[in-house]
């Protein structure tokens, strides 16, 4: 009975760990100084608030699980790369539209933290 209790406790701990990991931002250490926080995650839309420390880089990546993606700088100095175009300075208040699968990355080129809001319209919505 003691062994059975230990096995059940271990399984419960494993399930708890797996379910809690699925709710956390994706790989927070993959890009040091880049801190994403999910503000909303529904079947039709996902909204992230991303804080970037000075010099932090969000490496080039794609989103294949969304129809489109809006990138909206809120504060700071962001350099944004979209596809093969030259990087642009993304000023606060501007909005950038990206189709599904568009490679993009960004970095904080300023001396203070920068904040970006990302809105994703999910596939099937």
Where are these regions (language model features)?
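Bacterial N-terminal signal peptides that target proteins for export
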Residues: 1-8
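Bacterial N-terminal signal peptides
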Residues: 9-17
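Cleaved targeting-peptide boundary
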Residues: 22-30
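A short glycine-rich, His/Asp/Glu-containing loop-to-beta-strand
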Residues: 29-62, 66-67, 117-119, 123
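Histidine-centered metal-chelating micro-motifs
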Residues: 57-59, 79, 96, 100-106
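Short, conserved beta-strand element in jelly-roll/cupin
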Residues: 64-79
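Short acidic-glycine-tyrosine-enriched beta hairpin
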Residues: 84-101
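Ligand-binding loop in jelly-roll beta-barrel domains
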Residues: 101-125
């Amino acid at each position: 009975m003691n062994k059975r209790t230990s096995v059940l406790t271990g399984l419960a701990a494993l399930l708890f760990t797996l379910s809690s990991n699925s709710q956390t931002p994706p790989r927070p250490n993959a890009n040091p100084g880049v801190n994403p926080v999910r503000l909303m995650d529904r079947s039709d839309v996902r909204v992230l608030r991303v804080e970037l420390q000075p010099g932090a880089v969000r490496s080039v990546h794609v989103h294949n699980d969304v129809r489109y993606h809006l990138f909206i700088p809120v504060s700071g100095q962001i350099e944004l790369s979209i596809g093969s175009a030259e990087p642009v300075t993304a000023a606060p208040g501007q909005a950038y539209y990206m189709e599904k699968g568009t490679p993009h990355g960004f970095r904080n080129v300023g001396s203070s933290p920068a904040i970006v809001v990302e809105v994703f319209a999910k596939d099937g919505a």
